[in-house]
C-alpha cells in the first residue's frame, strides 16, 4: 500500500502509487513507527528537492528525519507553496531568488525572507489559500496553476491542462470562476523569467488545433 506522501497542487498530501519528478519536505510531520502523518507541516520552510543527490539513499519516513514528500513536477510543488532547496538545488534556488527579486521588487532576497511570504500566501485558516486572478488565466506565465471547481489546471502557452497524480490531460470543458492556486509572489517570479520543470505529459498533450487536424487527416484517408 502506498504511503501518504504525494502532494497535490492544493497542498493536500495523498496516497497514490504514481511517481513524481521531485521530492521535498515541510519538516518532520510523520510517526516513524506507523509511517503515517501527524500534521501537515512543522515549519515555514517548505522545500522542493531532487530525488537523487550525490548517490545518497534515504529510508522514507525514518526516525529523526524530515518527512519525504513527492510532487508530480515543480509546477505542482510551487502551486502547493514549496520553493527550491538551497542545499541540493542551489543553482535553481539562486535563479528563483533572482526572478523573485525581478518580479517582486526586492533586492538580494534570502530564503528567510521568502518563507514567511509564502506561508501567508499559501494558507488561510489552516487551509489552502486561493487568490483572485491577476489577469485572464490564458495570460498567466507558463507553470502557474489555477483552481476551478474540484479541478486543478496547469497553464502552458495560454492553454489549461487538467492535473492528475499520473500527469496532465487536455481540459474538456470551459474553465469558469477560476482562482489562482500558485502563490502570487511565485507567479510574478515566473513572469520575470523563472521556468519551472514540467512533467513530460504537459508537453505531449496536443493542442485542440493539432488534434482537429489529425482527425481531419484520418477521415480524409
Short names for language-model regions:
Residues 1-221:
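Mature, structured domains enriched in cysteine- and short glycine motifs
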Amino acid at each position: 500500500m502506498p504511503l501518504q506522501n504525494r502532494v497535490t497542487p492544493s497542498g493536500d498530501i495523498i496516497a497514490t502509487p504514481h511517481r513524481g519528478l521531485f521530492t521535498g519536505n515541510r519538516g518532520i510531520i510523520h510517526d516513524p513507527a506507523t509511517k503515517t502523518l501527524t500534521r501537515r507541516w512543522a515549519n515555514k520552510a517548505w522545500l522542493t528537492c531532487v530525488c537523487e543527490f550525490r548517490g545518497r539513499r534515504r529510508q522514507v519516513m525514518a526516525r529523526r528525519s524530515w518527512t519525504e514528500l513527492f510532487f508530480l513536477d515543480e509546477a505542482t510543488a510551487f502551486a502547493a507553496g514549496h520553493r527550491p532547496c538551497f542545499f541540493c538545488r542551489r543553482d535553481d534556488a539562486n535563479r528563483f531568488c533572482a526572478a523573485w527579486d525581478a518580479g517582486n521588487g526586492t533586492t538580494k532576497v534570502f530564503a528567510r525572507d521568502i518563507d514567511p511570504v509564502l506561508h501567508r500566501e499559501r494558507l488561510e485558516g489552516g487551509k489552502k489559500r486561493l487568490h483572485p486572478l491577476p489577469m485572464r488565466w490564458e495570460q498567466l506565465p507558463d507553470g502557474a496553476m489555477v483552481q476551478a471547481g474540484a479541478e486543478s489546471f496547469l497553464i502552458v502557452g495560454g492553454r489549461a491542462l487538467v492535473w492528475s497524480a499520473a500527469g496532465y490531460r487536455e481540459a474538456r470543458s470551459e474553465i469558469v470562476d477560476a482562482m489562482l492556486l500558485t502563490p502570487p509572489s511565485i507567479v510574478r517570479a515566473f513572469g520575470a523569467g523563472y521556468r519551472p520543470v514540467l512533467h513530460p505529459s504537459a508537453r505531449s498533450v496536443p493542442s485542440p488545433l493539432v488534434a482537429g487536424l489529425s482527425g481531419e487527416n484520418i477521415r480524409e484517408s
